[in-house]
Amino acid sequence: MREGGVMKKRLLALIVAFAVLTAGCLGSESKEVTLIVFHAGSLSVPFQEVEKEFSEYAERNLGIKVSFQDEASGSVMAVRKVTDLGRKADVIGVADYTLIPQLLIPNYTDFYVLFATNEIVIAFTDKSRYVEEMKSNPDKWYEILAREDVRFGFSDPNQDPCGYRSLMVIKLADLYYGKEIFKELIEENTNIYSNGTQIYAPKEITVNPGKIVIRPKETDLLGLVESGSIDYIFIYKSVAKQHNLSYITLPSEINLGDFSKEKFYGQISITLGSTGKTIKAKPIVYGVTVLKDAPNREVAIEFLRYLLSENGKRIFEKNHQDFLEPPIAFGNVPEELKPLVSIEK
C-alpha cells in the first residue's frame, strides 16, 4: 500500500508540473503577437521607427511582445493583395487615402484615417546629366528631361500612387506652362496617353527604355538614380530627403502638395488599367486602416493609436513628412482612436 501511495503522489506531482509548464507556455505564447502591415514604399522609414517604438511601448505598458511583418509596395498593390489575392493583414497604410473607400470599403474595412501629407519633387545626384543647369534653372526641368541623352523614371501608375501622381504633375504642367509637355515626355515615349485633361494608363505599359524607366514602387528607383543609371526621378519630397538626394521643388500649382490649389489639381484625372478606376488629382494625403478580419485587430488598433499620437507625429516630422493636425477619420471609428482624430461624416 505504501508503494502504491508513493506512486500516486509522484504521478500527481508530474500532472501538476505538466499543467504549470503548459500554462506557462500558453501564457507567454498569448503575449506574443506579429502584426502584418502592408504599406506604401514611401512609408517604410517612418513606419519602421514607429513600429520599433511601439514594440517597446507595448511590452512595457501592455505586457505584449509585438513584432512586425512589413510588406512595402505600391499602395494600389498593397490594397490588391487583400482584394485580389485574398491575403490577410492587420494594417494597411497607403499614400493615397482614396484607395481605401474606393477599394476596401465596405467589404474589408469600415473606417479609415487621413494622417500625413507630401509633395512631388524631381530628384537627382551629382552624376545626373545637366545637374548644374537643373539646379540653377529649375523652371527648365521639362526642357532638360526632354533632351535626347537624359533618362528619367517614375513608378508604375498601375501599382503605385507616386506613379500616377507623377503623370498628373506632368499633365498639370501642360496647363500651368501652356505647353505640350505631357505629349513630349510621356506620349512620345510610352503607350500612356491623354485626351484633354484625362490620362489613360494601360494595364500593360510599354516604354522607350532609352528614355524612361518604370519600377513597381518609387523607392525601387533610388538605386538607379544613385548609381547614375538614370538621371532624374519623380518622387516624394520626404523620400528624397530621407535618402539624401538632391532635388528641385515644383510650382505649387503642379506639385500636389498645396491644399489651396485643390481646384486647379482637380482638372486632371487618370484611369488605371489595373483597376478600371478613375482617380482625380488632389493634394497628397496618406491613409491608414485596420481590416475587419485582422488576425490581431485589438493590437493593430493600439498600434494605430500610437501612430496617430504625438509619438507618430514626432517620428514623421523627423523624417521630413508633415502630419495632419488633427488626423481626419471617416466611418465606424474605433473608440480607442476617437480622442486623437477629427471625425467626418
UniProtKB/Swiss-Prot annotation:
Entry keyword annotation includes Cell membrane = yes
Q: Is Transport a UniProt keyword of this protein?
A: yes
- Give any GO molecular function from the UniProt entry: metal ion binding
Name of a matching Pfam family = SBP_bac_11
Location in or out of the cell: Cell membrane
GO terms for cellular component = plasma membrane
| Any one biological process term the GO annotation gives | molybdate ion transport
Question: Entry's CDD domains?
Answer: PBP2_ModA_WtpA
Topological type in the membrane? Peripheral membrane protein
Position of the signal peptide:
1-27
Record-annotated residues binding tungstate?
A: G41, S42, S75, D160, P161, C162, E218, Y236
Q: List UniProt keywords, sorted A-Z.
A: Cell membrane, Membrane, Metal-binding, Molybdenum, Signal, Transport, Tungsten
- For the ligand (molybdate), the binding residues are G41, S42, S75, D160, P161, C162, E218, Y236
NCBIfam families, per database record: PRK04168.1, tungstate_WtpA
Assembly, per entry: Monomer. The complex is composed of two ATP-binding proteins (WtpC), two transmembrane proteins (WtpB) and a solute-binding protein (WtpA).
Give the protein family.
Belongs to the bacterial solute-binding protein 1 family. WtpA subfamily.
Q: Give the protein's biological function.
A: Part of the ABC transporter complex WtpABC involved in molybdate/tungstate import. Binds tungstate and molybdate, with a preference for tungstate.
Report what the protein is called.
Answer: Molybdate/tungstate-binding protein WtpA
Its lineage reads: Archaea, Methanobacteriati, Methanobacteriota, Thermococci, Thermococcales
